[in-house]
Amino acid sequence: MTVVYEDNHIIVVNKTASEIVQADKTGDTPLSETVKQYLKEKYQKPGNVFLGVTHRLDRPVSGLVIFAKTSKELTRLNEMFRTSEVKKTYWAVVKNAPQEPEGELVHFLVRNEKQNKSYAYDKEVPNSKKAILHYRLIGHSENYYCLLYTSPSPR
């Protein structure tokens, strides 16, 4: 685990691809538990350590995750994410070039709890949630393309 930033209120860590942020049905150790153990050892805290999960990244995604070290900070950060005061930006390396160098993708997502997966559809289907993604091609090599994308929707 790599700590990128830490103060009295938050800790920001680099999540590697394949790690989970919160516990799920797989039983794999989540990053949140690894961070709790780190804080417990670093500050020699007896008993339970508070750590609030402010957002998640999917298992196959790597990137920075912000955890709240106090319940008060968790409330503040949750409000900032809820009101889009925090702007999430993603970089993706893909093998196929996008049709346009810049654009918007709209899909409808359905979560399958039994499979622990989500599925994307081009048209609205029962129990789906609309997801919007804005992307821009920012570079490429001979075999790969780098996209910068943002999402105004929480999905």
Tell what function each PLM region has.
Residues 1-151:
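RNA pseudouridine synthases
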Residues 153-155:
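Positively charged, low-complexity/disordered segments
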